[in-house]
Amino acid sequence: MSDSQDPTTSPVVTTQVELGGCSRQGGGNGFLRFRQHQEVQAFLSLLEDSFVQEFLSKDPCFQISDKYLLAMVLVYFQRAHLKLSEYTHSSLFLALYLANDMEEDLEGPKCEIFPWALGKDWCLRVGKFLHQRDKLWARMGFRAVVSRQCCEEVMAKEPFHWAWTRDRRPHHGGVQRVCPQVPVRLPRGPGLSPPHCSPCGLPQHCSSHLLKPVSSKCPSLTSECHRPPSQNYLSRVKNAWGGDFLIVLPPQMQLEPGTYSLRIFPKPPARPGH
């Protein structure tokens, strides 16, 4: 600045830096902070929508909508510079699907988004949905990577909101080889209960209470949340991937990762008269 320039008429220089994948504004612009506050509140209000609430309740294991994936949705909204009027069901499902694309290895669970986003004839509209996802991605400048630090900065703006209590359990994280005894038909869509999850101890009729933990009415220790006694046994099923067979353990038997020896005893001969 020259000595003759009046500092009161000089333009305010605003700097923008990337910290942990999140934009941070400098220069003391209060409007930007107010705008960010509006965006957070609009997003949290969208999560309170009854249709979104129902969708989230069908994901009791938080496989496609845990707290980090939800935080990524808000980051995507901000990177795409969505208007507040664009904070809609459609935008949420597009951004959530893109977040799953970026972070999740399994393809099956995220397909549950299709019937919620597209309705009854969703299978005829998947192509258009994926095109809209790509348009959102382009609108974001193809910046879909979000760091954990960035997600936690988003959560810190409203640290006590129930959405940030959606912690995924360890057995649903990491790389896993999935060998289901009975294939689960996905997606299920609105009006149907989510698949039963033995490790989480969440039967279908209990999952609807687990959206907001403070209102949970189905503790895991009650008899209603246990599997039927008839299923508490070792069972042998055909291995679709080759080999002899798979052993399916009852939910009460929790084994640490390692190598185990399996001893199979011959079936005792039938007694006479039986």
From Swiss-Prot:
Entry function: Promotes progression through the cell cycle via binding and activation of CDK1 and CDK2. Involved in the spindle-assembly checkpoint. Required for recruitment of MAD2L1, BUBR1 and BUB1 to kinetochores. Required for the correct localization of the active form of Aurora B in prometaphase.
Protein name, entry field: Speedy protein C
UniProt main location, coarse: cytoplasm
Any Pfam family hit: Spy1
Keywords of this entry: Cell cycle, Cytoplasm
Family: Belongs to the Speedy/Ringo family.
Oligomer status and interactors: Interacts with CDK1 and CDK2. Interacts with AURKB.
InterPro entries xref list: Speedy, Speedy-Ringo_regulator
